[in-house]
């Protein structure tokens, strides 16, 4: 199992989650976050914003689904500009359903 975390522009969140749902990936968590990447914030006129509003999507997926999920997220969130976001993938050692105690996704 893998944990896929994507940091996205908030305006693309619905497009990404709809694309994932259309492909059968319904289970996810969305969190509104603030952060900055390589661009170190943004300057608009005389005002510099150190951190920008983003959305983080977290999904636990089977190993064989990772490439497809990344392709969907990347395709739906892409503008070609700095600030499009970042995707992180980590290994999950185990997952348990709290209500049943069942192990796995």
UniProtKB/Swiss-Prot annotation:
- Protein's UniProt keywords contain Magnesium: no
- Gene Ontology terms describing biological process: nitrogen fixation; regulation of nitrogen utilization
What Gene3D superfamilies does the database record attribute to this sequence? 3.30.70.120
Entry keyword annotation includes Nucleus? no
> Per its UniProt record, what InterPro entries does this chain match?
N-reg_PII, N-reg_PII-like_a/b, N-reg_PII/ATP_PRibTrfase_C, N-reg_PII_CS
Instruction: Report the GO terms under cellular component.
Output: cytosol
Which branch of life, at top level? Archaea
Per UniProt, the keywords (alphabetical) are: Nitrogen fixation, Transcription, Transcription regulation
- Gene Ontology MF annotations: ATP binding; enzyme regulator activity
One family name in Pfam for this protein:
P-II
- Of which family is this protein a member? Belongs to the P(II) protein family.
Q: Name the job this protein performs.
A: Could be involved in the regulation of nitrogen fixation.
Q: This chain belongs to which protein, by name? A: Nitrogen fixation nifHD2 region GlnB-like protein 1
Species assigned in the record = Methanosarcina barkeri
């Amino acid at each position: 199992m893998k944990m896929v975390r994507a940091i996205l522009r908030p305006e693309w969140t619905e497009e990404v989650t709809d694309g994932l749902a259309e492909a059968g990936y319904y289970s996810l968590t969305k969190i509104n976050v603030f952060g900055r990447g390589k661009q170190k914030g943004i300057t608009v006129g005389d005002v510099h914003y150190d951190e920008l509003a983003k959305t983080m999507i977290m999904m636990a997926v089977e190993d064989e689904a990772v490439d497809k999920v990344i392709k969907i997220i990347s395709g739906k969130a892409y503008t070609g500009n700095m600030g499009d976001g970042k995707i992180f993938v980590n290994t999950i050692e185990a997952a348990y359903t709290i209500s049943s105690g069942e192990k796995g996704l």
